[in-house]
Amino acid sequence: PIETTGQHAGVLIAKMGNEGIILTTEAAIESADSIEVALADGTVLEGAVKQRDTVADMAVVSIDLSTLSQEQRDKLPVIELGNSYSVKQGDLVVAVGSPAGVIHSTDYGVISYVVRNVQLVDGVGRVFYTSVNGAAREGTFLINLNGQLIGWVTEAYANAQNSGMAAVAGVSDYKAVLEDLSNGVAPPYFGIRGQEVSREQVEAGMPAGIYVVESVSDGPAYNAGIQNGDIITSIGEASVATMKEFQNQLDLLSSGDRVRVMVQRNGTDMYRELEFTVEIRGR
């Protein structure tokens, strides 16, 4: 067999007792038989996959801090998670990790523009575009001038219109996911991109709920029979009319749960109500 190796960057986001929690990209652990984590002082520790999120291309790796001296542990800083909702156009940012495509590289620049209410899988969020170089697979993390993590470069939102700019996922949209990953829990996966039916659309005759822009192929919703154009009106016993309500209900579920989902589907001349059972998976 041919042995292959790769190098990826990560950031230490928490210390829990003797365990260090490192955020990195899913590509960093993809098909890995073993993981080594090199600290800034050159110390190399064995890493273990805590959990991954293939939808958001994130992974958490843990390291055993008990093998370090007290001095080393004291000098190992945890990066603070910032508030990406406060990021605005023109803000100065620093990229660390692998912005040049190799680890230990850095870059700096500005936030060129902010896109709000971007349709994410199972939610909505903010995406920043920046002049900073960014290698998504190798791991590029953006920090503000207070030294706080505000996001990471992703390939999920790159397109021809913003060619030459790096797309950045804001950390605040993923804090609940990071908490799950850090605790070894797979975040719940429903598998849609959706948007709220507006008041004007309801007044025009559409049912209130979440309009399914995309039922992600081979996702739980797709496999249950939910289609593009369906309007989700309830999950379990709770009505959902906003993406926040949808996310709140999804957060109550775990991988393996089976939940009843009520949908309005547009027919030739009217909407009809359908019931589906969706089996939640881990992301």
Label for each model-derived stretch:
Residues 17-59, 63-66, 75:
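Catalytic-histidine neighborhood of serine endopeptidases
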Residues 3, 32-33, 68-76, 96-109, ...:
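Active-site loop architecture of trypsin-fold serine endopeptidases
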